[in-house]
Amino acid sequence: MKLIAYNKQLFTVALLLMMLCSFNSYAQITYVVSVGLGEYKYPDIAPPLPCSLGDARAVSHFFHNYNGSKVFMLLNENATRKHILKVLRTEFSKSTVNDEIIFVFSGHGIQGGLTCYETKDMSSIITYNEIQDIMKSSKARRKIILAMACYSGGLTLKSNNYNKKNTEKSSVMLYTSSRPGEVSWERSDMNNSFFISRILQAFHGAADKNSDRKITARELFNYVNPRVIGDTGGRQHPQLWGKFDDSMVVVYVK
C-alpha cells in the first residue's frame, strides 16, 4: 500500500510539472503597438493611403482576441512622432523575458525610417535606429517589427532576403513589405494591403504547415513572400531581416 501511495505521489508531482512547463510556454504577455496612417497633416507631401487604417485595425483586432495581449492602436493625428515613441518606450519597457513585443506600422516609408502624422522633412520621421534602440532595450526575447510602407526595405542598409544563419537570440526580427526602392502595393477596393492581408492569413493558421499550432518566423516568411510577390505581379518583395532563430514563434494559432 505504501508503494502504491508513493507511486501516486510521484505521478501527481510529474503531472504538475508537465502542466507547469506547458503553462510557462504560453504564459506570456504580447505587447502590440499598431500604427496606421491613412491621412497626414501635409497631404501634398504624404498623400492619403486607402488601406493603412484597415491594416492597423485588423492587426489590432487579431491581437485583441489573442490570449495575454495588450494592444495599443495609434491612428492618423494620434500617430505623431512624439506619441509613437512615447507609447513604444512606455509599453515595451514593461515586458519581461518571457513576453513578446510587436510593432506594426502601416503608412508612408522613406529610406531609413517611417513617417509620422506631421512629417514634412527628415527631422520629423522616426528612424530605424530609434525603433531598434527601443526594441533592444526591452527584456522580451521575441521582438518583432512588421512594416507595411513603401521603401520599407531601406529601413536598414543591411536589409537582405531571408538568412537562416541569423540565429542570435534576443534580437529584433524586422519584416518589411518591400525591398529598398520598391513601392508597397495596395488597392482602393481592398480593406488591407497585400502584405498585411497575407500576414493575417498566416497568423490565422494558413502558414502552419506542420500543424503544431505555432507560426514560426520561417513559416511566416515561406507563406507570405511568394503570395505577395504573386499578388503584385513581381513588383513587391517582402524582406525578413535580423538576427533571430528561424524557429522563433511569432504567434500561436487558436
Residue ranges and their predicted role:
Residues 23-254:
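Cysteine endopeptidase catalytic domains of the caspase/legumain-like
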Residues 12-22:
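Bacterial N-terminal signal peptides
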